[in-house]
């Protein structure tokens, strides 16, 4: 065996971390970064620098490198590709040995892949576009507490998307009035109602009071309709201890589902809460508050498809995904891609939808995709077509803004949904024939008729900021 000798000093990253001859192993974690280097920094050096700074490297050689097997543990930049329509940026593909990461810890994965390297001076912009988690790593993660099929069985709801509503105004209601709003929505035909992401335990409505009034409303609506109902009780809290306290109380009063803001609340807290939900038979709804700060800039940050994968590993039964047709950012092809990443067992590479790697989830359960944000009854045909059955279609203002009140808004959405599902099952093109389908259903539903009249001119036709790079070709 050759004796390794230490040579002090600074050398180019490419000498150690650029390996175009490398063939990734099935057990490697693979990452695709979009890199915009500083002027004068060539592609190979920039890619190697990212590989180094996100794995074992530092700015100079160190003698302690001789105490370990650097050839095994280092990240390897193994491929570079052009970014369509962008001469300044390029894609760098980097392979990391699985042993660089703690088992079952999305926190540890992110600390390396999106840690200090994102402040590296050699690059002007850096975006994590996609990650391939090998099955060997997937199996170390807890994943969704229950998954799609178990939730359908718990709630006894099959053959259609689920219907939800975020209670508005999002802040300022008393617990009693909040519970009243929940009751009207659930008795009108919705499956779920929801705390808004920024409802925690404020002076106008403390969490315990809200939980009690909401659970009473839920049970009353169940008794009157004969259907299972639920309300996403947000247990996000200042400390993990307080979060678990709220979750335990929700379980004690019989709530079937709780909620967590997984980015603002933190990945450690989310992973722990998902495990608690699995152990205690409680469903877990996940909100993505703060995601756009991280994922909306097309040249720097983390793409939402990565945040989607991280959530599936960390754990959640629902995740907000955007709507395509509503008020929030969301390119259609990209959205369809990350919806599949949430729900399917195996997703092949598909650049047309922004998916850079095959992803095998093995037996890990899927996650309901939640469409929420600026949607109303006129969007129903498109939503059913885009999201399919394993989704939650969540109408906030599109329920509570009905001229006749919450129950009428809920009834309008339920009639519209069932009309679209029936038409789809008959083989009709529900997006093209949506107006005719809804108009026919409205003949038997005055609530739907009024809703259609109220929102017929409401559209959100702004251009998408974060487009697929393939669209620039």
UniProtKB/Swiss-Prot annotation:
Entry's Gene Ontology BP terms: reductive pentose-phosphate cycle
Residues annotated as the enzyme's active site: 168 (proton acceptor), 287 (proton acceptor)
Binding positions for Mg(2+) per the UniProt entry: 194, 196-197
Cofactor(s), by name: Mg(2+)
Assigned keywords, A-Z: Bacterial microcompartment, Calvin cycle, Carbon dioxide fixation, Carboxysome, Lyase, Magnesium, Metal-binding, Monooxygenase, Oxidoreductase
Upregulation: Produced when grown in air or in air supplemented with 5% CO(2) (at protein level). Part of the cbbL-cbbS operon.
Biotech applications: Expression of 10 genes for alpha-carboxysome (Cb) proteins (cbbL-cbbS-csoS2-csoS3-csoS4A-csoS4B-csoS1C-csoS1A-csoS1B-csoS1D) in E.coli generates compartments that resemble Cb, contain RuBisCO and have its catalytic activity, showing it is possible to make artificial, functional Cb using these 10 genes. Cargo proteins can be targeted to these organelles. Alpha-carboxysomes are assembled in the complete absence of this enzyme in this bacteria, suggesting carboxysome-based microcompartments can be designed for applications such as custom chemical reactors or delivery vehicles.
SUPFAM superfamilies recorded: RuBisCo, C-terminal domain, RuBisCO, large subunit, small (N-terminal) domain
Manner of cofactor binding, per the entry note: Binds 1 Mg(2+) ion per subunit.
Entry superkingdom: Bacteria
Gene deletion effect: Does not grow in air, grows poorly in air supplemented with 5% CO(2), a high-CO(2) requiring phenotype (hcr), has apolar effect on expression of downstream cbbS. Expresses type II but not type I RuBisCO, does not form carboxysomes but instead smaller, empty cytoplasmic inclusions. A double ccbL-ccbS deletion is hcr and forms empty but otherwise normal appearing carboxysomes. Required for growth in ambient air.
Protein EC: 4.1.1.39
GO molecular function per UniProt: magnesium ion binding; monooxygenase activity; ribulose-bisphosphate carboxylase activity
Site positions for Transition state stabilizer: 327
Alphabetized Gene3D superfamilies for the sequence: Ribulose bisphosphate carboxylase, large subunit, C-terminal domain, RuBisCO large subunit, N-terminal domain
Family matches, as Pfam families: RuBisCO_large, RuBisCO_large_N
Effect of residue 72 to R: No longer binds N-repeats in CsoS2A
Renumbered residue ranges of the record's region Necessary and sufficient to target proteins to carboxysomes, interacts with shell proteins: 1-136
Subunit relationships: Heterohexadecamer of 8 large chains and 8 small chains. Forms a CsoS2-CsoS1-RuBisCO complex. The N-terminus (residues 1-136) interacts with shell proteins CsoS1A, CsoS1B and CsoS1C. Holo-RuBisCO interacts with the N-terminal repeats of CsoS2; binding is sensitive to ionic strength. A fusion of a single N-terminal repeat to the C-terminus of the large subunit of RuBisCO (cbbL) shows the repeat can lie between a CbbL dimer, making minor contacts to CbbS; thus each RuBisCO holoenzyme could bind 8 repeats.
NCBIfam families in UniProt: PRK04208.1
Family label: Belongs to the RuBisCO large chain family. Type I subfamily.
Function: RuBisCO catalyzes two reactions: the carboxylation of D-ribulose 1,5-bisphosphate, the primary event in carbon dioxide fixation, as well as the oxidative fragmentation of the pentose substrate. Both reactions occur simultaneously and in competition at the same active site. There are estimated to be 270 RuBisCO heterohexadecamers per carboxysome.
Miscellaneous comment text of the record: The basic functional RuBisCO is composed of a large chain homodimer in a 'head-to-tail' conformation. In form I RuBisCO this homodimer is arranged in a barrel-like tetramer with the small subunits forming a tetrameric 'cap' on each end of the 'barrel'.
Domain statement: The N-terminus (minimally 1-122, fragment 1-136 does not bind any better) interacts with the shell proteins CsoS1A, CsoS1B and CsoS1C. A slightly longer fragment of the N-terminus (residues 1-136) is required for targeting to carboxysomes, and will direct foreign proteins to the carboxysome, with reduced efficiency compared to the whole protein.
Record's protein name: Ribulose bisphosphate carboxylase large chain
Gene transcribed to yield this protein: cbbL
């Amino acid at each position: 065996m050759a004796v390794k000798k230490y040579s002090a000093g600074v050398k180019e990253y490419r000498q150690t971390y650029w390996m175009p001859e490398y063939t990734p192993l099935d057990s490697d974690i693979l990452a695709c970064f979009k890199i915009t280097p500083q002027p004068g920094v060539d592609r190979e050096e920039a890619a190697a620098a990212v590989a180094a700074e996100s794995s074992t490297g530092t700015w100079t050689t160190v003698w302690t490198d001789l105490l370990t097997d650097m050839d095994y543990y280092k990240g390897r930049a193994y491929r570079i590709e052009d970014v369509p329509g962008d001469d300044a940026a390029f894609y760098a593909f980097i392979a990391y040995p699985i042993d660089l990461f703690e088992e079952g810890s999305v926190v540890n994965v992110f600390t390396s892949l999106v840690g200090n390297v994102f402040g590296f001076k050699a690059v002007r912009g850096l975006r994590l576009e996609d990650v391939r988690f090998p099955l060997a790593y997937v199996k170390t993660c807890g994943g969704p507490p229950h998954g799609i099929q178990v939730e359908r069985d718990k709630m006894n709801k099959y053959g259609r998307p689920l219907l939800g509503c975020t209670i508005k105004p999002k802040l300022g209601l008393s617990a009693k009035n909040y519970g009243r709003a929940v009751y009207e929505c659930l008795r009108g035909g919705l499956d779920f109602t929801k705390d808004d992401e920024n409802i925690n335990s404020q002076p106008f409505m403390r969490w315990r009071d809200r939980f009690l009034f909401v659970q009473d409303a839920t049970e009353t609506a169940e008794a009157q309709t004969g259907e299972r109902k639920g309300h996403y009780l947000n247990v996000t809290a200042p400390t993990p201890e307080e979060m678990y306290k709220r979750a335990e109380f929700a379980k004690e009063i019989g709530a079937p589902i709780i909620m967590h803001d997984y980015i603002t609340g933190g990945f450690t807290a989310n992973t722990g809460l998902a495990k608690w939900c699995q152990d205690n038979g409680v469903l877990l709804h996940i909100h993505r508050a703060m995601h756009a700060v991280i994922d909306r800039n097309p040249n720097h940050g983390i793409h939402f498809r990565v945040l989607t994968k991280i959530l599936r590993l960390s754990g959640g039964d629902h995740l907000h995904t955007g709507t395509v047709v509503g008020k929030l950012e969301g390119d259609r092809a990209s959205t369809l891609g990350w919806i599949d990443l949430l729900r399917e067992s195996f997703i092949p590479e598909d650049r047309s939808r922004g998916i850079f790697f095959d992803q095998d989830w093995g037996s890990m359960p899927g996650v309901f995709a939640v469409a929420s944000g600026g949607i109303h009854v006129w969007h129903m045909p498109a939503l059913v077509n885009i999201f399919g059955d394993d989704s939650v279609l969540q109408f906030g203002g599109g329920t509570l803004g009905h001229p006749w009140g919450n129950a009428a808004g809920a009834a309008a959405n339920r009639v519209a949904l069932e009309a679209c599902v029936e038409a789809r099952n008959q083989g009709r093109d529900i997006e093209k024939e949506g107006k005719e389908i809804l108009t026919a259903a409205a003949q038997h539903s005055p609530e739907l008729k009024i809703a259609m009249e109220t929102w017929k001119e409401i559209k959100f036709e702004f251009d998408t900021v974060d487009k697929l790079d393939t669209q620039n070709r």
